[in-house]
Amino acid sequence: MNILDTLGNLVHQTAFFNLTIGNYIMIAVACVFLYLAIKKEYEPLLLVPIAFGMLLVNMYPAIMQEPVGDQAGGLLHYFYILDEYSILPSLIFMGVGAMTDFGPLIANPKSFLLGAAAQFGIYGAYFLAILMGFGGKAAAAISIIGGADGPTSIFLAGKLGQTDLLGPIAVAAYSYMSLVPIIQPPNMKLLTTKKERKIKMEQLRPVSKLEKILFPVIVTIVVVMILPTTAPLVGMLMLGNLFRESGVVKQLSETASNALMYIVVILLGTSVGAST
């Protein structure tokens, strides 16, 4: 009888006994994401940690549990706190800045308009969210998904106090970003002719080192003076770029664009996936 009781307790402690149909569906979704990331190589740096975080939390929900009394919270809960306080998105921007060459943008300022086109997606998502019954702040947080920008989506959701929506927004934004290689080609063919796709781009003018150094400094001053609340994201983006272009802090540039960037991607990806 003792052996049977022990076996019964063991069965009750397994994930199989405690999971709901919703958990099994999300486990299947996580496996699909892993397949797309590993087999199809669709944004594996994003999809692998997101999918694995999703897998873990749906088998063992306590891994995202908040601390209760003297009992510590789950591991991924502490990763997620870094999302809520906008620490990881800001560090991601610093890494992106350290990897980005703004030379083509400086040489051809008209290309700023390409980035402005993202606003159509943002406003479209905003009005769609309003029509679906979301409040103003919730719709504003959701709208950034339309710009396919994961770190900014997380940052704005936190700033607007929409922490209950932060997880779904982050998963939607990063899933959208990861699926761009699937979504983009058919849309490119739909919106352009074969002749337009064969247009040969002209060589842009050379950009001096002084221009590249001044660019992050000037952008930071102008943007933050106009919109002070953008300082965490714009400031970190331009700081990373200044590391790259100054040429005097090579170690910081390499760390921001490599080791630190990949550590942050792991923390951000697993915590975002676990928030589902």
PLM regions: where:
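Alpha-helical transmembrane segments
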Residues: 164-182
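N-terminal alpha-helical transmembrane segments of multi-pass membrane transport
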Residues: 1-71
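Core mid-bundle transmembrane helix pairs that form the ion/substrate translocation pathway
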Residues: 177-181, 188-244
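Hydrophobic transmembrane alpha-helices of secondary-active transporters
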Residues: 56, 82-106, 240-243, 261-276
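Transmembrane helical segments that form the transport core of multi-pass membrane transport proteins
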Residues: 220-276
